[in-house]
């Protein structure tokens, strides 16, 4: 299975046979092709798609805005969706006939919807560009092509979030409920973490009506290292937000989940869309390129020395330090590469935003901060925080990066504290959000991003709220968030010892709130989309390595180096590794509550086979006849290796429970449980009761 091409077109822009080319907004082939398709070939493909769509829709009385179809054409399978009543987005895949481990079509169809929702979140709706379709084409090139090219290079992107990715209009919530967790045992004297945010931030007179909402996410890293602990995925997702009228909550949540699961972490570069996969050069290609450039190395070296000498003689009064000149010399090759990349991207019309590399590289003519001023700023920040909370001393590394509390790291990823030399998206990321109670409902809001270990905070600000540009306000905001997240971290992760492995996993989809509560582990086996694809690496990784390794340099004091969310900066220090590490001794990285179930002990291959089996049952359930006003389907299925799957669907929710029957205490005990609850119909059906007491007790605790 491999991605073949993707196209976006609008048939309404064509009025006759002579201007059919106007309807084509985007057409991109993945990988290498033997010959470049002509415009007529592209138009013929979208013409066939329109014809089949019209034929199959002729008997359907529906507006068509949320329609989707799967079309088989020659050796391709084409996923096609219609959005905003007139725009079509089509994705074609090929080479699936002999692929026994092919990805189910539901995953790719869901990601086609997600790609549209993400584009709308970042750039606005397609219909908003009615007066400037050229700009729409440019934005489609800058977002859609890199988005799907990352999937083409790493096909497991569409499957690594388990069932939660199949429903693009829903979002996953974090669930910290555990058999050992009793909310009544909390100390009521201490202020809760969400009360701190509500009272000290949202309702504070400085922020009132300026901050629209605060979204709190728990995004722990997945780790396969033997010396690192893993945590159940039931805690992954949105912890909570503080408004009930944010209609685009599923979109912003799924966008963050996609970024985190695709690249393995969250950083400033990733949030601003400046990170994508690329193929590492093969050894032969590197050697050939080296031979081609050896003849130019000596001339470039002489020219570089001549320019450096002229610059030094012309700037004798600038008094640049040795470290500053070294930084300048090191970045010269990057500037040469940037010029070439920028020229190619300009002529092809692809990815203008990805050619901003030199904006991220420090230059020697910046207003550098002396070491004394830097120390003074650190002392002032530390003293102000000590006065606010003497029991939690804060050690600030940088006003933009943040600091540490014990073994925890915190700081802003996106905020006005970042250097003005960076693009504006690093100061505030504009997202197209829809608030039900707002006048315009849908508008672009300034969003700041802040992290505390594995917790990511999204601060949604009104476009006219200028308080976020004040340094003191952001410092105070960071301090209040630190207090809140420290309470949350202690409450849900380290409150009680419990490392039990549950004998069941579940997925609950609420059709009213659009929430998904799931404990099914993430992950899938490796899918090779193309044998010609070599090892992958992140395109911005080299710049991140350069920035972080030199974060203590005087020439970078005003640079505010970009950080990565999590307990440790996985790139900057050689002693850190991937996972939950905080750059300290591994012995301290022990979680008292891990939220694991028996599926966490399965291999990726067996877990994937289980997901495919459950997906087949879900498909058969959805294809069955049902009353649109009221229906209820309930099934208990036996899978391989003694695994039971309970599925129940009605108008309000979908419930999937995967039970390891071998870990039950015996069928006799289950029979007793059935007799115990048989007289009380409110406890559930006999099929549900047969899952065992641990499942029924868990369900009763949810209802409480």
Swiss-Prot record:
Location of the region described as Disordered in the Swiss-Prot/TrEMBL record: 281-322
Function comment: In complex with MON1, is required for multiple vacuole delivery pathways including the cytoplasm to vacuole transport (Cvt), autophagy, pexophagy and endocytosis. The MON1-CCZ1 complex acts at the fusion of vesicles with the vacuole, through its regulation of the SNARE complex during the coordinated priming and docking stages of fusion, and particularly at the stage of tethering/docking.
Keyword Amino-acid biosynthesis: no
Signal peptide (from-to): none
InterPro entries: Ccz1, CCZ1/INTU/HSP4_longin_1
Self-association state and partner proteins as the record states: Forms a complex with MON1. Interacts with YPT7. Interacts with YPT10 with a strong preference for the GTP-associated form; may interact with other small GTPase Rab5 homologs but at much lower levels.
Protein name as catalogued: Vacuolar fusion protein CCZ1
Activity control summary: The YPT7 guanine nucleotide-exchange factor (GEF) activity of the MON1-CCZ1 complex is autoinhibited by the N-terminal disordered region of MON1.
Keywords: Autophagy, Endosome, Membrane, Protein transport, Transport, Vacuole
Miscellaneous comment text of the record: Present with 2870 molecules/cell in log phase SD medium.
GO process annotations (BP): autophagosome maturation; autophagy; cytoplasm to vacuole targeting by the Cvt pathway; late endosome to vacuole transport via multivesicular body sorting pathway; macroautophagy; protein targeting to vacuolar membrane; protein targeting to vacuole; vacuolar transport
Subcellular location: Endosome, Multivesicular body membrane; Prevacuolar compartment membrane; Vacuole membrane; Vesicle
A Gene Ontology cellular-component term: intracellular membrane-bounded organelle
GO molecular function, one term: phosphatidylserine binding
Family per record: Belongs to the CCZ1 family.
């Amino acid at each position: 299975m491999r991605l073949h091409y993707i196209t976006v077109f609008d048939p309404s822009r064509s009025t006759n046979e002579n201007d059919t080319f106007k309807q084509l907004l985007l057409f991109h082939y993945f990988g290498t092709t033997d010959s470049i398709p002509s415009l007529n070939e592209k138009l013929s493909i979208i013409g066939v798609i329109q014809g089949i769509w019209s034929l199959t829709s002729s008997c359907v009385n529906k507006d068509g805005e949320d329609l989707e179809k799967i079309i088989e054409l020659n050796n391709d399978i084409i996923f096609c969706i219609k959005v905003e009543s007139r725009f079509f987005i089509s994705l074609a895949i090929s080479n699936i006939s002999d692929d026994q481990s092919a990805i189910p079509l539901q995953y790719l169809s869901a990601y086609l919807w997600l790609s549209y929702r993400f584009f709308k979140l970042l750039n606005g709706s397609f219909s908003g560009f009615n007066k400037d379709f050229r700009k729409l084409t440019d934005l489609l090139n800058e977002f859609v092509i890199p988005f799907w090219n990352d999937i083409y290079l790493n096909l497991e992107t569409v499957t690594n979030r388990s069932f939660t990715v199949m429903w693009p209009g829903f979002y996953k919530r974090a669930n910290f409920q555990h058999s050992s967790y009793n909310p009544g045992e909390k100390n009521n004297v201490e202020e809760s973490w969400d009360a701190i945010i509500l009272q000290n931030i949202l309702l504070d007179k400085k922020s009132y009506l300026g901050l629209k909402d605060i979204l709190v996410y728990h995004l722990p890293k997945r780790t396969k290292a033997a010396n690192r602990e893993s945590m159940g995925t039931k805690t992954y997702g949105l912890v909570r937000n503080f408004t009930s009228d944010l209609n685009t909550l599923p979109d912003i949540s799924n966008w963050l989940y996609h970024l985190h699961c695709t690249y393995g972490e969250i950083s400033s570069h990733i949030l601003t869309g400046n990170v994508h996969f690329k193929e590492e050069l093969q050894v032969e290609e590197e050697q050939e390129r080296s031979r081609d450039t050896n003849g130019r190395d000596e001339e470039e070296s002489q020219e570089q020395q001549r320019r450096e000498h002229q610059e030094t003689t012309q700037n004798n009064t600038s008094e640049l330090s040795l470290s500053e000149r070294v930084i300048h010399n090191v970045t010269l090759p990057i500037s040469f590469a940037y010029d070439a990349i920028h020229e190619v991207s300009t002529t092809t019309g692809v990815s203008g935003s990805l050619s901003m590399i030199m904006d991220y590289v420090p230059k020697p003519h910046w207003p550098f901060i002396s070491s004394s001023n830097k120390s003074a700023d650190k002392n002032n920040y530390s003293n102000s925080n000590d006065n606010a909370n003497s029991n939690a001393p804060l050690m600030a590394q940088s006003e933009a990066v943040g600091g540490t509390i014990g073994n925890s790291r915190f700081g802003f990823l996106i905020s006005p504290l970042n250097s003005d030399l960076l693009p504006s998206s690093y100061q505030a990321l504009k997202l197209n959000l829809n608030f039900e109670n707002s006048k315009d409902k849908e508008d672009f809001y300034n969003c700041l991003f802040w992290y505390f270990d594995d917790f990511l905070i999204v601060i949604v600000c009104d476009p006219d709220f200028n308080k976020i540009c004040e340094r003191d306000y952001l410092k105070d905001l960071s301090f209040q968030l630190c207090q809140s997240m420290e309470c949350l971290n202690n409450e849900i992760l380290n409150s009680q010892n419990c490392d039990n492995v549950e004998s069941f996993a579940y997925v609950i989809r609420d059709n009213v709130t659009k929430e998904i509560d799931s404990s099914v582990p993430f992950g899938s086996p490796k899918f090779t989309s193309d044998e010609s694809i070599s090892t992958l690496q992140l395109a911005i990784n080299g710049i991140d390595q350069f920035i972080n390794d030199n974060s203590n340099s005087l020439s970078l004091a005003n640079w505010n180096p970009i950080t990565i969310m999590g307990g440790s900066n996985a790139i900057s220090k050689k002693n850190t590794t991937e996972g939950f590490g905080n750059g300290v001794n591994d012995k301290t990285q022990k979680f008292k509550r891990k939220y694991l179930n028996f599926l966490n002990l399965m291999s990726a291959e067996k877990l994937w086979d289980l997901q495919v089996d459950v997906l087949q049952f879900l498909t058969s359930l959805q294809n069955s006849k049902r009353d649109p006003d009221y229906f209820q389907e309930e099934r208990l299925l036996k899978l391989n290796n003694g695994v039971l799957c309970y599925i129940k669907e009605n108008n309000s929710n979908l419930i999937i429970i995967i039970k390891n029957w071998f870990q039950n205490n015996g069928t006799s005990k289950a029979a007793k449980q059935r007799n115990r609850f048989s007289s009380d119909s409110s406890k559930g059906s006999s099929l549900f009761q047969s899952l065992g007491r641990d499942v029924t007790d868990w369900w009763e605790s949810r209802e409480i």
